């Protein structure tokens, strides 16, 4: 199985499976001389790790990241400085329950990658989904922690903006609220609504989809290139690579189809300091594939997890009809823990384009 690497200059390779002894990543292309502490990476993994509320999978993983290479430890015994060589990171799996998956070793769960993996490779790791499990994304979040160090002054933040048909009220948007509730919601008023709604979903053994919004502020103008190296193109590709993602939009996205040219185009004026300013940001901070200097705004939709308790029709590897009820521990809404994953993917895309722009134009922004 190839295609486990993404990026051009800031390259990330992830490895490992859901029920293996460990998983991790190798970050190649990180510039030398960047200093950080382990806690600077762990904070993002803690945001993604399972078992933190009744609304996510109850699998218990500490997700403690270990940095194995690519850094030198400073005299204080805590600060690490990148050397420019590959940074290898490892996260151990400690709470696997492979016995929950014995019955589906030869059966294809509807909505999962079981059938297509078997079809393509002739073999699949059925234990927790193996490589197709969202467990792999812990390594991406670790890589995203490194990516955040690369571009000075950039802040990447994400929030859950919709669960099922229940959307936030954007007039209530408050970033300070995001880490104060189990949903990463910027709207405190929607939290009790989501709690009641997801409790019902969870008790029925079902699942529901969601929409996540990621905003990168402080992105320098000029990142990205026309046609085949657009910044939004690469952001969309990385977000689409996340498990269960079925749609991505930048800026106004699909809503742009409902607006006129007058309403959609972001008008400009010269600011008092002699620099141009935009009067709106319908484009999501990107024009012609190149960043404008405005906040980069992306949203992505995740489908309901296919692991539900409802019995469903399928087939097995011998071509027989079977009825399947999924066992194991699963998220009733995978969108919750997708928030830090989306942040990591956007951070990696911005870091990669920052290094590519620096290499092409020679400008240090």
From Swiss-Prot:
Species of origin: Rhizobium johnstonii (strain DSM 114642 / LMG 32736 / 3841)
Binding site for FMN: 131-133, 243-244, 288, 303-307, 329
The protein's annotated pathway: Metabolic intermediate biosynthesis; chorismate biosynthesis; chorismate from D-erythrose 4-phosphate and phosphoenolpyruvate: step 7/7
Protein name: Chorismate synthase
Positions bound to NADP(+): 48, 54
Sorted UniProt keywords: Amino-acid biosynthesis, Aromatic amino acid biosynthesis, FAD, Flavoprotein, FMN, Lyase, NADP
Gene Ontology BP terms: amino acid biosynthetic process; aromatic amino acid family biosynthetic process; chorismate biosynthetic process
EC number: 4.2.3.5
Cofactor(s) in the UniProt record: FMNH2
Taxon lineage: Bacteria, Pseudomonadati, Pseudomonadota, Alphaproteobacteria, Hyphomicrobiales
Role played: This reaction introduces a second double bond into the aromatic ring system.
An MF annotation (GO) of this entry: chorismate synthase activity
